[in-house]
Amino acid sequence: MKKNTDSEMDQRLGYKFLVPDPKAGVFYRPLHFQYVSYSNFILHRLHEILTVKRPLLSFKNNTERIMIEISNVKVTPPDYSPIIASIKGKSYDALATFTVNIFKEVMTKEGISITKISSYEGKDSHLIKIPLLIGYGNKNPLDTAKYLVPNVIGGVFINKQSVEKVGINLVEKITTWPKFRVVKPNSFTFSFSSVSPPNVLPTRYRHYKISLDISQLEALNISSTKTFITVNIVLLSQYLSRVSLEFIRRSLSYDMPPEVVYLVNAIIDSAKRITESITDFNIDTYINDLVEAEHIKQKSQLTINEFKYEMLHNFLPHMNYTPDQLKGFYMISLLRKFLYCIYHTSRYPDRDSMVCHRILTYGKYFETLAHDELENYIGNIRNDIMNNHKNRGTYAVNIHVLTTPGLNHAFSSLLSGKFKKSDGSYRTHPHYSWMQNISIPRSVGFYPDQVKISKMFSVRKYHPSQYLYFCSSDVPERGPQVGLVSQLSVLSSITNILTSEYLDLEKKICEYIRSYYKDDISYFETGFPITIENALVASLNPNMICDFVTDFRRRKRMGFFGNLEVGITLVRDHMNEIRINIGAGRLVRPFLVVDNGELMMDVCPELESRLDDMTFSDIQKEFPHVIEMVDIEQFTFSNVCESVQKFRMMSKDERKQYDLCDFPAEFRDGYVASSLVGINHNSGPRAILGCAQAKQAISCLSSDIRNKIDNGIHLMYPERPIVISKALETSKIAANCFGQHVTIALMSYKGINQEDGIIIKKQFIQRGGLDIVTAKKHQVEIPLENFNNKERDRSNAYSKLESNGLVRLNAFLESGDAMARNISSRTLEDDFARDNQISFDVSEKYTDMYKSRVERVQVELTDKVKVRVLTMKERRPILGDKFTTRTSQKGTVAYVADETELPYDENGITPDVIINSTSIFSRKTISMLIEVILTAAYSAKPYNNKGENRPVCFPSSNETSIDTYMQFAKQCYEHSNPKLSDEELSDKIFCEKILYDPETDKPYASKVFFGPIYYLRLRHLTQDKATVRCRGKKTKLIRQANEGRKRGGGIKFGEMERDCLIAHGAANTITEVLKDSEEDYQDVYVCENCGDIAAQIKGINTCLRCSKLNLSPLLTKIDTTHVSKVFLTQMNARGVKVKLDFERRPPSFYKPLDKVDLKPSFLV
């Protein structure tokens, strides 16, 4: 019994992470990291970026400077709620204002004199409009007092015209580990990026590359385009660190394999040859000469001292305030990795590994754009001052330049899907699924152009570094995004940190490191470098590394550093480094802690009794050593046990090798995969297809469907699923519903429900079963004069319009009806005409195949009349509509049957849906049967022993055997009816019933699987996809059907099609289209005697059957499809003879000529 308790304990701890944690400010866990990211930007980071004081121009040896100062940054929230924004048809934005002062500083003997040039106090209501992220319950980070709407999970932006926008998270291009590349045999590069800390603004980027060619070891250089000299890295390290070449040799050779030591010796010897080739070599003189040569090459206007200071001071911006000696030791540690990677590439994190990447969240998007646009804004001011001084001789700035920062356009482009000239960051949220609001903000994708340029084809595979942090099921199955977009698992999140918190945390960690004995943290020759965000701070005694890391992790969990998401990674395997990561954009998730071979949750006896009353933050405070937040880099270089069960089966010595233990399998799925049931009981592809279909399921009504003029599909009578997982419940996907419970029967019905075809009951449809309502936006722009023109002849298209020229509310629009008046008029140049004014209707018509009711009409009057109309339509299931279960058993309505046509059980109950029974075996979806069994068992006992309603927990991925669920169903039926016989009980457990034929009223020979299941309706609707028609609009030029389904278009028969029919004949053309393609065409030889296909032996076609009989038949060449040839071969292999016979008739071109009589006609 203890084993079961322990296995439940890790599951309960995992559930604690998923539920809200108000004490820690977590009200909605799935999107909490996005809320924090955006809140950090708009409350803190925006002020840091916009608050600027820096020189624009300098003159006279820097004694005169033009300065710019931006201050008084204020961010004001909107006065209305998101629902009011929807009613008004406006965006939901915050207003940012600031004050700009431009002045001239002149250095005099008395001091600095300041002369004002220009200023602007930004009070414009449109200066900077920042789209506000709507959080859980319609909250926003600027005004947390907004009322809560429980079913609104947020995570979206409301763009102009009240269109919701939502986007994925992009993988940052800059890597935290240097990128190793084999250029050609024996030629390698090691490139890395250096980015200044978040407190340094504007952010400085430097990109460096170390090159090595085995044939030219003297050219082991480090370089950077226009920002650094090209120099031998060994000599640069010596220059910065002030150590000897022998010191560098010992440092590079320490704890390295023999082959690497040999290469190190060769490299140091080559560096010595450089020094020996120069008379009286001095390292300072050598570097100064290279700097002077670079100064001349770049034709810099700076003095040589300023140029040298700029180049060397800004070298490695991420170590900006670090002494040069530590920079030199950092270069030595990089060189160690480079040389080791040459021989052991597979042990080094490759460029596709998520260990090397940070992730851009919503706040980071806006932060990057704000930083870039501010630099453009300041650059425009600088250019305007220079132009005015050049043309007018005065230092002045045009007011238009001051009042147009450019951020509005950048933010608008961001919400339109363009982030720094690359697509894929944002997309419009489709309103048919609640899961899209969760799945898209939790998706992580690569830049599309990054994949094309860098040729990162291997990234499309499931990378080992994604294990546990990403869902392996919820990935695109087809299209250009395959392998480029991944879904976070339910326990994963992305870190965020304020600049002030970053600096405090860095200070505390440095103080902790320096609390060690000085000699123990100064092992720069043979020690383990300690880096904080890649910045070297110390080098630890190798004998102390295990104690240091263990103590650091314990202090971190106890809150010693004030941040529980710090990552500490011990990199062994000869690379020898301790990496401490504290920055934003890291993937983190909780793990169970293993300390000295003991699972720490076992040594806390009070935890189990107190767990129900505690939140996740309470566990971290009161039991700090039970759970640890681990980033993906620390996880990759740690020993992690797969499950608690496997950990307990190990010996004590084996347990001591592990650092962490994982939670059960259900926590490795994403939130979309968690909406499925028992995917580990099905075949693998069903999980991927199930996730794609679950995101296409139509869900319940949104809170402001009648206010928001936007496209949407909504389920009319949703039901909460009975069989759920904990993630489905805590994410509120279950509460917001995305389907209905229906009664299904697995059987064949008159041969109609073949393949994906399903039979659906007519009365079920009439009662509102899986009924939906479609909201559709229609938008037209009409010239003002056209809108004011009156129609001369009454048009049927204007029958639904009122006198004001707009469509009536509650009018039912049909195909061809106009939504607003649009009459174009023209004057004829005819003096004899009585009325030279002609007018004609150019209005846009309603084109859908179904009638819709007008719900709302909005009009904006500018230079044009912009009319937006919202139409609503209730749409019941019809032939061709698609449905699915949560196990990816997709079905298409093949027949709508009356209740009298369907089989019934002993109680007269008929199934709502009949599904082809063979689909279970072909698709191997055993969990669909389990879901029906559990749902039926719930109906027998819907309450627990305390009288509380309890849904059935059936996680998407679980380690529970099927027998356990059968036992659960057995107990439910025995509780409600203990007198059942064994056969009756077995039939109820396995949902087997005797059904009766509706035509004969006789029972079927075998029992039928019959029970309830949660059924989903997909957004693929027949009437939205129908495009082909015989009658309709025609183009004026060619008098054929126009193109496009929205315009009522059809198939056009063009000139090329006409010419083919005329020249080739209709029959031959159809044959070519259907058969004679390059991929399908095949020539075969057929024996005219026996009808077999001839075999080719040594290049000679032979009929095997006739050759054995010593016959010499005639072989005739025919053209056929490859599929036909394979079919005949397969049939022959199964003993079925298919004879190809030829029609015997005289040839049409070689028949005997008719006799011609040449006698004169009068003699005949």
Curated annotation (Swiss-Prot):
Transmembrane parts of this sequence: none
Pfam families linked: RNA_pol_Rpb2_3, RNA_pol_Rpb2_5, RNA_pol_Rpb2_6, RNA_pol_Rpb2_7, rpo132
Catalytic activity: RNA(n) + a ribonucleoside 5'-triphosphate = RNA(n+1) + diphosphate
E.C. numbers: 2.7.7.6
One GO MF term attached to the UniProt entry: DNA-directed RNA polymerase activity
Any one of the GO BP annotations: DNA-templated transcription
Keywords, alphabetical: DNA-directed RNA polymerase, Metal-binding, Nucleotidyltransferase, Phosphoprotein, Transcription, Transferase, Virion
InterPro entries documented for this protein: DNA-dir_RNA_pol_su2, DNA-dir_RNAP_su2_dom, DNA-dir_RNAP_su2_hyb_sf, RNA_pol_132_poxvirus, RNA_pol_bsu_CS, RNA_pol_Rpb2_3, RNA_pol_Rpb2_5, RNA_pol_Rpb2_7
An annotated GO cellular component: virion component
Cell compartments where the protein resides: Virion
Summary of the function given for this chain in its UniProt record: Part of the DNA-dependent RNA polymerase which catalyzes the transcription of viral DNA into RNA using the four ribonucleoside triphosphates as substrates. Responsible for the transcription of early, intermediate and late genes. DNA-dependent RNA polymerase associates with the early transcription factor (ETF), itself composed of OPG118 and OPG133, thereby allowing the early genes transcription. Late transcription, and probably also intermediate transcription, require newly synthesized RNA polymerase.
Subunit structure, as described in the record: The DNA-dependent RNA polymerase used for intermediate and late genes expression consists of eight subunits 147 kDa, 133 kDa, 35 kDa, 30 kDa, 22 kDa, 19 kDa, 18 kDa and 7 kDa totalling more than 500 kDa in mass. The same holoenzyme, with the addition of the transcription-specificity factor RAP94, is used for early gene expression.
Membership in a protein family: Belongs to the RNA polymerase beta chain family.
Protein name listed in UniProt: DNA-directed RNA polymerase 133 kDa polypeptide
Gene source species: Vaccinia virus (strain Western Reserve)
